């Protein structure tokens, strides 16, 4: 439950709100548009202006509506207090006006955005934008009075004390100038103004103190006059609502010296007038200023008049003097005790908590069967005969705590957690049992009959081996086939395996060539060895061609000269013939036309990179479009050269 409203955002006046939103639109949206631009760009430019302005107003209105409390959702004490201070209907009407303005601004934004979609020129779009912002400004200007009122309410709400209606509370009330604020200053650290005249306190003041490690709040209320509630002003009604709504101990202060300006008869009469507000509350009458006059010093008539307040059930009278701080703490402690006792009594009287606990409890009772047998609870014989534990019995079963004390106490004696294990041999209790062995969970292989099962498996394995279960005769595989058929099957199997290997290799080669440039088949270089292999596979005799190739090779062989003899010792391993150095730029190109075409394409590809000053195809560096040292703070007229 919200108890204070100190975080409500400031409510700007209508003109200031208008300036804030319009300046924000001008700063955060583009400002340059020209008639030569595409019409869709012009429409988008002005639609953005309208939408941004509408969203700015809606955002401000939302902050106002969400910041202020909903007067119907707060505690009745706060609701009546706000009604007294701010006039509930006026408060609701002001918030409703803001909510209505928000709806109208949203509607204007939607309507003019729809119209801007069909704008035909820059001038038309500009006029539509101007009309939209003008209508929004008119709506905001009509909120002049509600916004001023809400700002005043916000300031007052921020100064209101934080009062918790459900905590332990001492409520101080009575006629003006009877010492209420002085008592609050004595028992708390609240800085309350104290003056020797009436109606010094015009609002509720709260102080906090501790009693028996519990937090209490004491509330000083404005003075009340004995008159009908219809004639009471806002200051007095604050006290009435506090007494009516807060669960507290009411401390009614009286001044027997009559220096407050009111007689004892008037003070007693006021007590009986507000007596209906004391229902379900503990009440204490505190007689203040006993340093001037005490109850014993009154005449008999006034004593009898004072005793009439005791006719109310549960009322006690105590005396104190705040000026001399006499009996102040005793009065405070007595009021706290009465409050704590009444709160405990109310808790015991309320059946809600008991009902909530009883709803969670269910006692299961066995239902009678058709045969009529009474099913009594079953108690095992060992449990029934079990002897009750008696600490004085010397033959009693020792508890773990007693064993610990006998062996040195906590920190010296360690409890053996394996002592209660049920095993065949008690010596096994303290054996080290690994949890993980060879990467496997040991508990997965635990079995009381594991040795018997292992022996049965070994016997079955020996029996299968002796029967020849695992033996495999190759002749049985080809049973029903003669030798020629078996040989043919094996040859086919060998051919299939070889064919599968070739297919796998061919697939791998295709994948390897996927990302490489391909040459047309007609342009690929062919060697004599490839032709010989292909023709031989087709069944042609290549002997004559081999002889011709050998003769051609002899003619092309490099003839050794005298220079080769002179410089031959300079190289350890001279080649059999000179190898011609090839040009890698032209190796992959078939003829001159293809070469010129490739050069033109390469030149076009380099042109874009050169224009953008790229180092290569992989250069993706994005340079600053506006270098700060060239553009920061520079103005054309030369007025400013830095920010």
Curated annotation (Swiss-Prot):
Domain OBG-type G: 168-340
MF (Gene Ontology): GTP binding
Chief location of this protein within or outside the cell: nucleus
Gene Ontology terms: biological process: ribosome biogenesis
Annotated residues for binding of GTP: 174-181, 220-224, 288-291
CDD domains: NOG
Biased composition range(s): Basic and acidic residues: 594-622
Compartments (UniProt record): Nucleus, Nucleolus
Region (Disordered): 568-643
One Pfam family cited in the UniProt record for this chain: NOGCT
The keyword Nucleus belongs to this UniProt entry's keyword annotation: yes
Alphabetic keyword roster: GTP-binding, Nucleotide-binding, Nucleus, Ribosome biogenesis
Gene Ontology CC terms: nucleolus
Coiled-coil residue spans: none
Family indicated by similarity: Belongs to the TRAFAC class OBG-HflX-like GTPase superfamily. OBG GTPase family. NOG subfamily.
Function: Involved in the biogenesis of the 60S ribosomal subunit.
The protein's name in its UniProt record: Nucleolar GTP-binding protein 1
Organism of origin: Kluyveromyces lactis (strain ATCC 8585 / CBS 2359 / DSM 70799 / NBRC 1267 / NRRL Y-1140 / WM37)
